Amino acid sequence: MSNNVEEKILHGTTTVGIKAKDGVVLCADMRASAGYFIANNNTMKIQKIDDHAGLTLAGGVADAQNIVDILRYHSNLHRVEKHGPISIHSLARLCSLIFHQNRGYPFMADILVGGYDAEGPALFNIDMFGSVEKKAYVTTGSGSPVAYGLLEEEYREDLTVEEAKKIALRAVKAAIVRNIGTGDGINIAIMDKDGFRLLTEEQKKAVIEL
């Protein structure tokens, strides 16, 4: 990856994904930046793909939104044709295929796909060239070096969703303190046996204050 392309992906944003024993947590800040200019301070970087799956976005907004639309379409199509939800692994492979087919003119995005299916919780990282990695925990964006420090210190294989969401929030908060491309609030989503749901402001406040 050239330095110029890598800079486009890494500049701004911190997203975090954690796979717990009973679900997946996705967390992201709300700042959209263009260089040193804050373009938007209320950006939703966590998107619902289906009732059981979601993703986080880092990189170019237009490219990332295009990928979200494609994944939603195919996930809905799978429900119609197969009479059931697409697996999280298949969703990640589809995302990989989209990136790989466009590698000549790559989407400037880095995606975390997570969810809960018949096999349990699953979390994947897909980069702009289509590489797929299954993850226990992962962070993307310019604040990721800071967030990784906290994740590596606190992650355990037996984490519950309740514990994971606290760690994810602390990781993004740490990035907000140290990274100028990260800020303006935090969103967090949980995917477990009860499906996809975003935490409300009251629920986030309760976790942050713990």
UniProtKB/Swiss-Prot annotation:
Known EC number: 3.4.25.1
Active-site residue list: T13 (nucleophile)
GO BP: any one term: proteasome-mediated ubiquitin-dependent protein catabolic process
Protein encoded by which gene: psmB2
Entries under InterPro entries matching the protein: Ntn_hydrolases_N, Pept_T1A_Psome_bsu_arc, Pept_T1A_subB, Proteasome_bsu_CS, Proteasome_sua/b, Proteasome_suB-type
UniProt keyword terms in alphabetical order: Autocatalytic cleavage, Cytoplasm, Hydrolase, Protease, Proteasome, Threonine protease, Zymogen
Family label: Belongs to the peptidase T1B family.
Its job: Component of the proteasome core, a large protease complex with broad specificity involved in protein degradation.
SUPFAM superfamilies: N-terminal nucleophile aminohydrolases (Ntn hydrolases)
Protein name: Proteasome subunit beta 2
Annotated control of activity: The formation of the proteasomal ATPase PAN-20S proteasome complex, via the docking of the C-termini of PAN into the intersubunit pockets in the alpha-rings, triggers opening of the gate for substrate entry. Interconversion between the open-gate and close-gate conformations leads to a dynamic regulation of the 20S proteasome proteolysis activity.
Species of origin: Nitrosopumilus maritimus (strain SCM1)
Enzyme class, UniProt record, top EC level: hydrolase
Keyword Disulfide bond: no
Alphabetized PROSITE patterns for the sequence: PROTEASOME_BETA_1, PROTEASOME_BETA_2
Subunit composition and interactions: The 20S proteasome core is composed of 14 alpha and 14 beta subunits that assemble into four stacked heptameric rings, resulting in a barrel-shaped structure. The two inner rings, each composed of seven catalytic beta subunits, are sandwiched by two outer rings, each composed of seven alpha subunits. The catalytic chamber with the active sites is on the inside of the barrel. Has a gated structure, the ends of the cylinder being occluded by the N-termini of the alpha-subunits. Is capped at one or both ends by the proteasome regulatory ATPase, PAN.
Cellular compartments per GO CC: cytosol; proteasome core complex, beta-subunit complex
Pro-peptide positions on chain: 1-12
Localization (cell): Cytoplasm
Reactions performed catalytically: Cleavage of peptide bonds with very broad specificity
Gene Ontology MF terms in the entry: endopeptidase activity; threonine-type endopeptidase activity
